[in-house]
């Protein structure tokens, strides 16, 4: 594999994602299925055509970025298996921000696998003080409840997950702190 070949595959995958029929938000999950794929090295895409979900194999467990929409849990589990990974190995989950379409499978992973949940400090505060901003009530058929965050991330934090070190930044915009990450 070369960077050029990998980038070509990435562009093809983006085309497939953009052409996929999305269905209606928060349901019709079967219309948003995207075949999971390896992005590069130990980084995988297991999300759907609406919400990105990524997995990093850290060598000491899986790190998952976001948890999809309400109703996406079965698809995420299947996609993880399809990549040759085990969902029970998801040790950590980082939420990009505190909206319901990014934490649909959190409660399942916490209950089943004791996955530790990480989120930016301002969104953790939002969960506590203004939970309606998570938009669960707007989801119609979503039965998910808010959950406890295990680790509140601050600006500039550097955390290690297995053999993967990540630098975090809090960027206001879509919410008070959309959480871009830099894998180092």
Residue map of PLM features:
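Conserved beta-strand hairpin/beta-sheet module of binuclear metal-dependent hydrolase folds
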Residues: 29-87, 180-183
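Short Gly/Pro-enriched turn/cap motifs at secondary-structure boundaries
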Residues: 34-35, 45-46, 141-144, 148-150, ...
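Core dinuclear metal-dependent hydrolase active-site scaffold
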Residues: 36-38, 55-57, 155-184
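Active-site HxH/HxHxD metal-binding segment of metal-dependent hydrolases
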Residues: 43, 71-74, 81-160
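Structural motif
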Residues: 61-63, 92, 164
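N-terminal pre-domain segments of enzymes
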Residues: 1-33
């Amino acid at each position: 594999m070369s960077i050029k070949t990998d980038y070509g595959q990435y562009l093809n995958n983006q085309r497939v994602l953009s052409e996929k029929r999305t269905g209606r938000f928060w349901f019709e999950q079967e219309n948003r299925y995207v075949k999971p794929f390896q992005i590069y090295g130990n980084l995988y895409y297991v999300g759907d055509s609406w919400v990105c979900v990524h997995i990093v194999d850290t060598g000491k467990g899986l790190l998952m970025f976001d948890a999809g929409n309400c109703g996406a849990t079965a698809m995420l589990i299947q996609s993880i298996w399809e990549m040759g990974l085990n969902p029970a190995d998801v040790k950590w989950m980082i939420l990009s921000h505190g909206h319901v379409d990014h934490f649909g499978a959190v409660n399942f992973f916490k209950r089943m696998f004791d996955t530790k949940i990480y989120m930016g400090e301002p969104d953790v505060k939002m969960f506590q003080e203004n939970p309606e901003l998570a938009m669960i009530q707007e989801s119609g058929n979503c039965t998910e409840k808010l959950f406890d965050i295990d680790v509140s991330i601050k600006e500039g934090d550097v955390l290690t997950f297995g053999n993967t070190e990540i630098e975090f930044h809090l960027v206001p915009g879509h919410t008070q702190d959309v959480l871009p990450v830099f894998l180092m």
